[in-house]
């Protein structure tokens, strides 16, 4: 699944975002692309289940691929 981030992103956002996504699914593979402002997550969960974690970290995202 892939999410588009509407907020500005910096390289120091990568760690907190990865931890937030792994709080939803500890086995998830998370890839953050700061330049493209996208986050790819390989998980068996539904994309909607990650939206709360993004919101908790104050990121406004949309699902662009499920």
Segments and roles (model prediction):
Residues 1-8:
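Short glycine-/aliphatic-rich beta-strand segments at the starts of folded cytosolic domains
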Residues 8-24:
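Short amphipathic alpha-helix segments
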Residues 37-42:
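A generic structural motif
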């Amino acid at each position: 699944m892939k999410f588009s981030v509407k907020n500005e992103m910096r390289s120091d956002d990568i760690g907190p975002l990865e931890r937030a996504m792994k709080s939803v699914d500890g086995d998830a593979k998370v890839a953050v692309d700061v330049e493209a402002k996208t986050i790819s997550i390989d998980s068996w969960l539904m994309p909607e289940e990650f939206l709360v974690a993004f919101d908790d970290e104050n990121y406004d995202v949309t699902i662009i691929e499920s």
